[in-house]
Swiss-Prot record:
The keyword Cytoplasm does not apply. SMART domains: AAI (SM00499). Gene3D superfamilies: Plant lipid-transfer and hydrophobic proteins. Keywords: Disulfide bond, Secreted, Signal. Induction: Induced between 4 and 8 hours after treatment with auxin and remains high for at least 24 hours. It comes from the Eukaryota. Residues 1-23 form the signal peptide. This is Putative lipid-binding protein AIR1. One of its GO terms (biological process) is response to auxin. Disulfide bonds join C28-C58, C38-C57, C74-C110. The gene is AIR1.
Length: 111
């Protein structure tokens, strides 16, 4: 019978490394109230061109890569979660991403 020490060490190391890789991913918020905080960013940028309070909106997409953040916000805007009647998708999406110091990939289109 083979010793169990190498097998136990192998399983332990696999569990350890798997835990590290799966704990670092962000997710797109599914709560419409959370994503609705981004509306204030759009309204304040349109009205006051100053320094809008962006922390609530940017913190929602903080753990996401740029492409994931763009897809998340695009899906929210398209689903009318944000409650905006007349929206210009490319401009509003780029405003939200720029305010959060993010960039959509050049080939990305929110259609």
């Amino acid at each position: 019978m083979a010793p169990r020490t190498p097998l136990a060490l192998f399983v332990s190391l696999n569990l350890l490394f798997f835990t590290y890789t799966s704990a670092t991913t962000g997710t797109c918020p599914k709560n419409s109230i959370e994503i609705g905080t981004c509306v204030t960013v759009l309204n304040l940028v349109d009205l006051t061109l100053g320094n809008p309070p962006v922390k609530p909106c940017c913190s929602l997409i903080q753990g996401l890569a740029d492409l994931e953040a763009a897809v998340c916000l695009c899906t929210a805007v398209k689903a009318s979660i944000l409650g905006i009647v007349n929206i210009n998708l490319p401009i509003n999406l780029s405003v939200l991403l720029n305010v959060c110091s993010r960039n959509a990939p050049k080939s990305f289109q929110c259609a």
